[in-house]
């Protein structure tokens, strides 16, 4: 099992804290939060001597693939740079947000938004494949429900070459049935963003800080996606508490039968 720590709690200068993460755990970085020089310098530090793997979260700020107002040509340029990062530093996957909130411009149609999101996702996936990059489609946290569970699975599920990262916190927030999601997508789920919440917001709590039955989750994980990477995407550190949460998580994993 690959366990990866997101650098979400350590954006910017504070990324140096990630050097304290034990070397067996990997790192997931947000590509848009640094230029090439920044990542050249920082990855030398945080990945030095590390057996854990690197993954990269693709750009998402001000990007909504479902919106007519999205400048998709600029999005493609941004992802080309990100795919270059993936290959330069041998990252195992790149994460894609396939849509944002429901656009607020007059005349937006939900069905057209789903179609636009799918078409653009497929184009980015083709670009990724041409570069030998594994692009993973993530479920979103927005409670205004541009895509609920049914729409997400109906829109992206039939495209058999697509691969997925399921964000547990986003699924919890929107009351998705995780057993149904995992049993539908199965081993096309290549990774998870692991975090929790109380249904009151996308708070990115650590395993053990929220109400989720993680033993039940790991029963489904073992049945349907046993090789998927676990990316701990927490809002806060410190590193020692993140590592402690891994111990809690693994207790649930071992208890899952």
Give the predicted meaning of each segment.
Residues 46-61, 116-128, 156, 214-217:
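Alpha-helix-loop-beta-strand connector modules within alpha/beta enzyme cores
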Residues 19-21, 45-46, 85-88, 123-127, ...:
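Alpha-helical scaffold elements within enzyme catalytic domains, especially in hydrolases
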Residues 71-164:
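Active-site acidic/histidine proton-transfer and metal-coordination neighborhood
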Residues 2, 14-20, 76, 92, ...:
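Histidine-acidic metal/acid-base catalytic patches
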Residues 1-87, 254-257:
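N-terminal pre-domain/capping segments
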Residues 2-7, 25-29, 54-58, 94-96, ...:
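Hydrophobic faces of well-ordered beta-strands that scaffold small-molecule active sites
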Residues 60-64, 100-104, 196-202:
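Conserved radical SAM core fold
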């Amino acid at each position: 099992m690959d366990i990866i720590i997101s650098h979400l709690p350590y954006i910017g200068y504070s990324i140096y804290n990630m050097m304290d993460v034990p070397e067996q755990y990997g790192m997931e970085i947000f590509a848009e939060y640094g230029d090439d020089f920044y990542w050249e310098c920082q990855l030398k530090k945080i990945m030095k001597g590390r057996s854990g793997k690197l993954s990269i979260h693709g750009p998402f700020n001000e990007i909504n693939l479902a919106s007519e107002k999205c400048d998709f040509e600029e999005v493609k340029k941004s992802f080309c740079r990100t795919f270059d990062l993936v290959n330069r530093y041998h990252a195992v996957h790149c994460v894609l947000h396939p849509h944002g909130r429901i656009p607020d411009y007059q005349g937006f149609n939900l069905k057209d938004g789903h179609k636009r999101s799918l078409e653009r996702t497929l184009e980015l996936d083709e670009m990724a494949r041409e570069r030998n990059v594994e692009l993973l489609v993530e479920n979103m946290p927005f409670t205004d429900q541009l895509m609920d569970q049914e729409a997400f699975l109906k829109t992206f599920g039939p495209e058999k070459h697509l691969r997925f990262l399921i964000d547990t916190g986003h699924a919890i927030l929107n009351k998705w049935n995780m057993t149904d999601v995992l049993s539908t997508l199965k081993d096309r789920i290549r990774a998870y963003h692991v975090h929790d919440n109380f249904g009151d917001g996308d708070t990115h709590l650590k395993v053990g800080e929220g109400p989720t039955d993680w033993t039940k989750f790991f029963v489904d994980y073992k049945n349907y996606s046993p090789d998927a990477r676990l990316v701990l995407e927490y809002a806060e550190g410190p590193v020692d508490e993140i590592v402690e949460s891994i111990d809690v998580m693994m207790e649930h994993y071992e208890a899952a039968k």
